[in-house]
Swiss-Prot record:
Positions that bind Zn(2+) 1: 39, 42, 66, 69
Name by which UniProt lists this protein: Cellulose synthase A catalytic subunit 5 [UDP-forming]
Topological relation to the membrane, as annotated: Multi-pass membrane protein
Family to which the UniProt record says this protein belongs: Belongs to the glycosyltransferase 2 family. Plant cellulose synthase subfamily.
Lineage, uppermost ranks: Eukaryota, Viridiplantae, Streptophyta, Embryophyta, Tracheophyta
Principal place of residence: membrane
GO molecular function: cellulose synthase (UDP-forming) activity; zinc ion binding
Enzyme Commission number(s): 2.4.1.12
Organism: Arabidopsis thaliana
Length: 1069
């Protein structure tokens, strides 16, 4: 091999050799070798450099790239060579970009800003090596006009895309908008901008921009098939990306190392401190209060385990960014139908009296007006209460949508829920330039007020239900007069029936669904309603993606669906994503957020941590699903590339490693075959239990159809739609036949002997079906994504007061207890699947946390007991113990501060979350634990009422009202007991004196810790507006008094030995 006296270098990671020059004058390749080559990105010929030599972009591999592509890649791309991935260095005559070294080309600063002296005019303005002297050109001379790097002979001299100044000193150019008058004189808009930016597609004419992109796509296809084989196939991640349309639609943004590394180190340090703390606590018991010490140590160990389960899933938090412009470039091409995937939106409601129809109507209107192709959106409203009020309100909503939807899209209104748009105090004229906007906004506001009056009239009419029930306009009875016994109902209000808006544009589909209900059937509450919507939508529209929102969660960001599609439709990473979860944001909450309704710590810290693992858990609303994932299919397996071997190891070492690798691969293949065989056997057993000859049956089409029907149900239309990964319907299906099939799939007995609720759809078995559903999908190897756009995608209404908030938390905790006591418990379910171990820890924490209520209740009672008895849970504290306690409390505080820093959470939100953790733990979690045990073990059913979402006229009129509920008694009792203990402890110290104030300080600090966490109750006791109901106060004081007197009477922690006063009398003194 003739090396020409140069050094040869290579690597096992690159399939190439690099020739290193022996002296500075030598080049990697000569000018003769590179002359005449074409750019491997755009296909144009490579021009000469400033020095008159052939342009070489990469000094490592000399991959042929022209200067405009090189500068575009450095300015807009990843700034690296497409072949060897080496970062491009700045070449003489090219503009600087962020990341260039300070001394890089310092001798070229003049040429960087003055192109007239560098001889760069020809290659900047002409990609075909056409040379002309710009400085000497007369004002009236014909200058070749360029469109995105190519000459366009059809453009007249009066319609210049680039304006060149005749002065020899410098060159001006303009990013000119398209003027309708060709005689209009263009002028520079940004004279300081670098002229080179126009060499690679920065002219603002949209039609030419699209034409240029089309030509670039064609050139790219030629290069991809006929060019260098090292570029790989179309799915390879190493393919060079020429424009934004081929770049990823989203990217991960890890937390800065300056924030996350100290946080991780502190977690490890806190683990060490915890170990030393428990070592001290266990080896130093309190002899005169052994029971108190033992109980406290048990509680502390449980708290430590709970902290580990909560902490480690936050080890690798990340954030994400989306690129909506790239999504449009890739899937929305001008002159062609949109290629964005369809989305079926599910809205669920039950009781229109507690979930006002006006709130549901606003949610539906925000969905119909979403910024997405109308033929790709369908809204399905599930009315599980079969209320005629909901039906009529939805009919009025469909009529008003004909005016509201075109108004929103014409003026880009945000948010697109009219109630919140008109009530928000904001500058609605900002960025509005249309002269008719103010007039049309006033008219639209008047129309919406009339719409509200109609809805209010319907609500008032529905208050008085006729004895014989409601009837339709033609006199036929309303099918849903009996809520528990009625047929299935489907009504298509908008969509394919020809109803258009006032501007004659098509509207998204709007479908009313009320599934069949009969006595004796288990309808599985919300999970059953959602599964009915899956089947109905699969028959009528069959979009590949589903969005689930509650009736009070409207779309606050009209581009929310596009945000989700940036993840779902990403060709590189989208195939393995089962759902995109958005955070919950709320309206109608005061600034202090006294009851932690926003739940900021969970959504901005915990969920970001889970996103760095296998993805966030499903929280029940604001989630875009992949339909195939809900159907119980496994995630696509990623093919592992073979590892490269290195020649630097001895042969005997490679031989040993190869033997171990072969053994491991054989074992893995054997296990894989066994698993596949067991799956096939299990599938055949499910198809035909107790029969023989299953091998023959499995080969027949009838057996395959039987298997699908056993899984999805007895609907051939729906079974056929389930096999379409990209959605769509049969071409020969008529709307009438599809409607009949949709009625069938929402019948009561459709799910019998199928896998609905077990392996398909929303999973049954818990009132928190959201946790189970997400857990099932993660167990199948799918991953989820947490999307937090700058403008919140969805907003909803939070519980009005503390009582409703506690009932909401009670429902969540009861669902966790049900999952813990079921076969789907993450402690023992799903091993051998695709669930990662840190993700499993998060699911274990989500079902274990209600059990913390028992040690928390006991631990919050200990301060009062210590103050009443004069005992304490720790012995006399030494210097070592003092340092240990201070280190523990300090690590807890600093961990919280660092979490707030990288999670961007305020101190107020963090403290409210800590308060409500104690309040909910000693009230709702405790009740949920006992109700869950009764429900699972004894079969005692618990009925939950829907949380009221109606608001009064006052902004926060009911926010702090304490309504009667037994959930308020335990925390109030704890508060009173600790206040009594503080009073008794201080009084005893003043009366009798203390040898050491240290023990008293420790007990008082312990008691005040509990009182501060229960402060909202204390404010309810003392405040006027927030006063607690008298019955709760009476019961709490009575219970606290009984417990205090009983404790003083029993006094179990006082030694029983010693003199007895009745025997020795006064001589004992």
């Amino acid at each position: 091999m003739n090396t020409g006296g140069r050094l040869i270098a290579g690597s096992h990671n690159r399939n190439e050799f690099v020739l290193i020059n022996a002296d500075e004058s030598a080049r990697i390749r000569s000018v003769e070798e590179l002359s005449g080559q074409t750019c491997q990105i755009c296909g144009d010929e490579i021009e000469l450099s400033v020095d008159g030599e052939s342009f070489v972009a990469c000094n490592e591999c000399a991959f042929p790239v022209c200067r405009p592509c090189y500068e575009y890649e450095r300015r807009e791309g990843n700034q690296s060579c497409p072949q060897c991935k080496t970062r491009y260095k700045r070449i003489k005559g090219s503009p600087r970009v962020e990341g260039d070294e300070e001394d890089d080309g310092i001798d070229d600063l003049d040429f960087e800003f003055d192109y007239s002296r560098s001889g760069l005019e020809s290659e900047t303005f002409s990609r075909r090596n056409s040379e002309f002297d710009l400085a000497s050109a007369p004002p009236g001379s014909q200058i070749p006009l360029l469109t995105y790097g190519e000459e366009d002979v059809e453009i007249s001299s009066d319609s210049h895309a680039l304006i060149v100044s005749p002065s020899p000193g410098h060159i001006h150019r303009v990013h000119q908008p398209h003027f309708p008058d060709p005689a209009a004189h263009p002028r520079p808009m940004v004279p300081q901008k670098d002229l080179a930016v126009y060499g690679y597609g920065s002219v603002a004419w949209k039609d030419r921009m699209e034409e240029w992109k089309r030509k670039q796509n064609e050139k790219y296809q030629v290069v991809k098939h006929d060019g260098d084989s090292s570029l790989g196939d179309g799915d390879d991640a190493d393919i060079p990306m020429m424009d934004e349309g081929r770049q990823p639609l989203s990217r991960k943004v890890p937390i800065k190392s300056s924030k996350i590394n100290p946080y991780r180190m502190l977690i490890v340090l806190r683990l060490v401190i915890l170990g030393l703390f428990f070592h001290y606590r266990i080896l130093h018991p309190v002899n005169d209060a052994y029971a108190l010490w033992l109980i406290s140590v048990i509680c502390e160990i449980w708290f430590a385990v709970s902290w580990v389960l909560d902490q480690f899933p936050k080890w690798y938090p990340i954030e994400r960014e989306t690129y909506l412009d790239r999504l449009s470039l890739r899937y929305e091409k001008e002159g062609k139908p949109s290629e964005l995937a369809g989305v079926d939106v599910f809205v669920s409601t039950v009781d229109p009296m507690k979930e006002p129809p006006l709130i549901t109507a606003n949610t539906v209107l925000s969905i119909l007006a979403v910024d997405y192709p109308v033929d790709r959106v369908a809204c399905y409203v599930s009315d599980d209460g079969a209320a005629m009020l909901t039906f009529e309100a939805l009919s009025e909503t469909a009529e008003f949508a004909r005016k509201w939807v075109p108004f929103c899209k014409k003026y880009t209104i945000e948010p697109r829920a009219p109630e919140w748009y008109f009530c928000h105090k904001m500058d609605y004229l900002k960025n509005k330039v249309h002269p008719a906007f103010v007039r049309e906004r006033r008219a639209m506001k008047r129309d919406y007020e009339e719409f509200k009056v109609k809805i209010n009239a319907l609500v008032a009419t529905a208050q008085k239900v006729p004895e014989e029930g409601w009837t339709m306009q033609d006199g036929t009875p309303w099918p849903g007069n009996n809520v528990r016994d009625h047929p299935g109902m489907i009504q298509v209000f908008l969509g394919n029936n020809g109803v258009r808006d006032v501007e004659n544009n098509e509207l998204p589909r709007l479908v009313y669904v009320s599934r069949e209900k009969r006595p004796g059937f288990d309808h599985h509450k919300k999970a059953g309603a959602m599964n009915s919507l899956i089947r109905v939508s699969g028959v009528l529209s069959n979009a590949p993606y589903l969005l689930n929102v509650d009736c009070d969660h409207y779309i606050n960001n009209s581009k929310a669906l596009r945000e989700a599609m940036c993840f779902m439709m990403d060709p590189q990473s989208g195939k393995k994503i089962c759902y995109v979860q958005f955070p919950q944001r709320f309206d109608g909450i005061d600034k202090s957020d006294r009851y932690s309704n926003r739940n900021v710590v969970f959504f901005d810290i915990n969920m970001k941590g889970l996103d760095g693992l296998q993805g966030p858990i499903y929280v029940g609303t604001g989630c875009v699903f992949r339909r195939q994932a809900l159907y119980g299919f496994d995630a696509p397996k990623k093919k592992k590339t073979k590892r490269m071997t290195c020649n630097c190891w001895p042969k005997w070492c490679l031989f040993c490693c190869g033997l171990r690798k072969n053994r491991k691969s054989k074992t893995t293949d054997k296990k894989k075959k066994n698993r596949e065989a067991s799956k096939q056997i299990h599938a055949l057993e499910n198809i035909e239990e107790g029969t023989k000859g299953t091998n023959d049956a499995a080969k027949s089409p009838e057996a395959a159809q039987l298997k699908l029907e056993k899984k999805f149900g007895q609907s051939p239309v729906f079974v056929a739609s389930a096999g379409m990964e990209n959605g769509g319907l049969a071409r020969n299906a008529s709307p009438a036949s599809l409607l009949r099939e949709a009625i069938q799939v929402i019948s009561c007995g459709y799910e019998d002997k199928t896998e609905w609720g077990k392996e398909i759809g929303w999973i049954y078995g818990s009132v928190t079906e959201d946790i189970l559903t997400g857990f099932k999908m993660h167990s199948h190897g799918w991953r989820s994504v947490y999307c937090t756009p700058k403008i919140p995608a969805f907003k909803g209404s939070a519980p009005i007061n503390l009582s409703d908030r506690l009932h909401q938390v009670l429902r969540w905790a009861l669902g966790s207890v049900e999952i813990f006591l079921s076969r789907h418990c993450p402690i023992w379910y799903g091993y051998g699947g695709g669930l990662k171990w840190l993700e499993r820890l998060s699911y274990i924490n989500s079902v274990v946390y209600p059990w913390t209520s028992i040690p928390l209740l006991v631990y919050c009672s200990l301060p009062a007991i210590c103050l009443l008895t004069g005992k304490f849970i720790v012995p006399e504290i030494s210097n070592y113990a003092s340092i240990l306690f201070m280190a523990l409390f300090g690590s807890i505080a600093v961990t919280g501060i660092l979490e707030m820093q990288w999670g961007k959470v305020g101190i107020d939100d963090w403290w409210r979350n800590e308060q409500f953790w104690v309040i909910g733990g000693v009230s709702a979690h405790l009740f949920a634990l006992f109700q869950g045990l009764l429900k699972v073990l004894a079969g005692v059913e618990t009925n939950f009422t829907v949380t009221s979402k109606a608001a009064d006229d006052g902004e926060f009129s009911e926010l702090y009202i304490f309504k009667w509920t037994s959930l308020l008694i335990p925390p109030t009792t704890l508060l009173i007991i600790n206040v009594i203990g503080v009073i008794v402890g201080i009084s005893d110290a003043i009366s009798n004196g203390y040898d050491s104030w240290g023990p008293l300080f420790g007990r008082l600090f312990f008691a005040f810790w509990v009182i501060l966490h229960l402060y909202p109750f204390l404010k309810g006791l003392l405040g006027k507006q927030d006063r607690m109901p008298t019955i709760i106060l009476v019961w709490s004081i009575l219970l606290a008094s009984i417990l205090t007197l009983l404790w003083v009477r029993v006094n179990p922690f006082v030694a029983k030995g010693g003199p007895i006063l009745e025997i020795c009398g006064l001589d004992c003194l």
